Amino acid sequence: MYLHKIAVNTEVFFMWNKIKQYLPTYIIGIAIPLTVGILAAALTRDSMDIYGTLKTPPLSPPAILFPIVWSILYVLMGISSAGVYSARELNPASASLGLKYYAVSLALNFLWSIIFFRLSAALPALICLIFLLYYIIRTIIEYIKVKPWCAYLQIPYAAWVVFAGYLNVGIWLLNQ
């Protein structure tokens, strides 16, 4: 019984050390996409009202749903990128490339908001979304070579961007 307690305590100790070691990485990993999202929202806040005036395609969710979904996605994206960064020694080339693709996807994500809302340019925003989806897929491909669960956390992001593409096309066609 005593040896079992020592083994459990040792395991808890090692687990706590691992958490302490990687916690800052995960906090930063989550903070990065959330900051990008907050910045994009702040820069497009005055233009968001346009969404309510547009003709939208079937299945268009209410505007209140977007910040909720994006917040969840940003947290998943941050956990995913932090997981790859923390395990980069497993496959340095794929980790590096995947994180670069992820950075490009964050930039495109930010640009889409500006193009669609601030510039009211649905077609250029759609082109931006196509590139965004490409970089998300590339990110997933590289992440899976490092930590598969990190790649899986990017799948909801890709799915939402496909849905955003559908909405973007619908808005573009219905509001010409």
Task: List each model region and its residues.
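Helix-adjacent hinge/juxtasegments
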Residues: 75, 79-113
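Membrane-helix boundary connector in multi-pass membrane proteins
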Residues: 115-121, 137-152
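N-terminal membrane topogenic signal
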Residues: 16-29
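Terminal transmembrane helical module of multi-pass membrane proteins
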Residues: 144-176
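Membrane-interface helix termini and inter-helical loops of multi-pass transporters
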Residues: 45-59, 90, 175
